[in-house]
Amino acid sequence: GSAKVDAYAICPCSMGTLGTIASGTMSNLIHRAASVAIKEGRKLVLVPRETPLSDIHLENMLRVRRAGAVVLMAAPGFYHQPQEIGDLIEFVVGRCLDQLGIENRLTKRWGQE
C-alpha cells in the first residue's frame, strides 16, 4: 500500500470479515487495508462482536493473531463498576485506542482514583 497509515482498526469485525482476512483473500477495501497492514507489519486491531464462537471462528482468530493482528473481543470489563451502557462501550473503545497507541481517558486505569 502506498498510503502511509500507522494503524488500522476494524470495529466491529464480523466473523465473515475476520475469516476473509485470515484466508488472505480480498473482496473490498476493508479486506485490502487489513491485508496491507499484515504484509507491512503495521498495527491491525480486529474487534469481533459475535458469540458464541465456533471452532472455525477460533481457528481464524488464531490465524490472524499469528499473522500479527491484535484480536480484541468486544467484551467490556466490569471491575470499574460501570453505571450506564455508555460506560461499557467506552471500556471497549478505550482498549481499542490503547492498542492503536492513541492516548485516551475513557476509563480509569488500574490504581487510579
Predicted regions and their residues:
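Helix-loop-strand module that forms the ligand-binding subsite of alpha/beta enzymes
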Residues: 1-59, 64
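Glycine-rich, flexible loop/turn motifs
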Residues: 14-17, 25, 68, 74-75, ...
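Short flexible/disordered coil segments
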Residues: 26, 50-53, 71-74, 104-113
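Short, glycine-/small-residue-rich phosphate/pyrophosphate-handling segment
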Residues: 39-95
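SAM-dependent methyltransferases
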Residues: 86-87, 91-113
